[in-house]
Amino acid sequence: MGITKKPDLNDPVLRAKLAKGMGHNYYGEPAWPNDLLYIFPVVILGTIACNVGLAVLEPSMIGEPADPFATPLEILPEWYFFPVFQILRTVPNKLLGVLLMVSVPAGLLTVPFLENVNKFQNPFRRPVATTVFLIGTAVALWLGIGATLPIDKSLTLGLF
């Protein structure tokens, strides 16, 4: 689109508009019908062609065939449930595990009240929110990686 929308600076009408101080909104082609009827379908069809081409040239396998007589030793949830699964697996009391999971959104709801978020948009000028984000990300990654390991190595990730 950058090539098709490039203004012709040799055009005397455009030069006159620019000399009067009229900005970039006063030149170029209108979005309707040019973009919506000509450029966007080309982009959409090109994207679909790339996806179909990749699917034909490099098909991904669906997975292992299901065998009802061979149960895996440990059934793991989907990857986005790994931290929650790890909490429930390591905490001995299930009620405590559920309370730990509920405390995460409750703690995140208190962050705006701990500091004035509307005052600054720079994350370095909001140390509480930045610290909560960094520690939460590190804990989620730690728990997620630990969920894929055996229970005896899950909390230390086999490092200690």
From Swiss-Prot:
Signal peptide: none annotated. This is Cytochrome b6-f complex subunit 4. GO terms for cellular component: chloroplast thylakoid membrane. It comes from the Eukaryota. The keyword Plastid applies. It is found in: Plastid, Chloroplast thylakoid membrane. The chain crosses the membrane at residues 36-56, 95-115, 131-151. Keywords: Chloroplast, Electron transport, Membrane, Photosynthesis, Plastid, Thylakoid, Transmembrane, Transmembrane helix, Transport. The gene is petD. Changing residue 3 to V: In strain: cv. IPA-6. It comes from Solanum lycopersicum (Tomato). One of its GO terms (biological process) is photosynthetic electron transport chain. Belongs to the cytochrome b family. PetD subfamily. The 4 large subunits of the cytochrome b6-f complex are cytochrome b6, subunit IV (17 kDa polypeptide, petD), cytochrome f and the Rieske protein, while the 4 small subunits are petG, petL, petM and petN. The complex functions as a dimer. It is a multi-pass membrane protein. Component of the cytochrome b6-f complex, which mediates electron transfer between photosystem II (PSII) and photosystem I (PSI), cyclic electron flow around PSI, and state transitions. GO terms for molecular function: electron transporter, transferring electrons within cytochrome b6/f complex of photosystem II activity; electron transporter, transferring electrons within the cyclic electron transport pathway of photosynthesis activity; oxidoreductase activity.
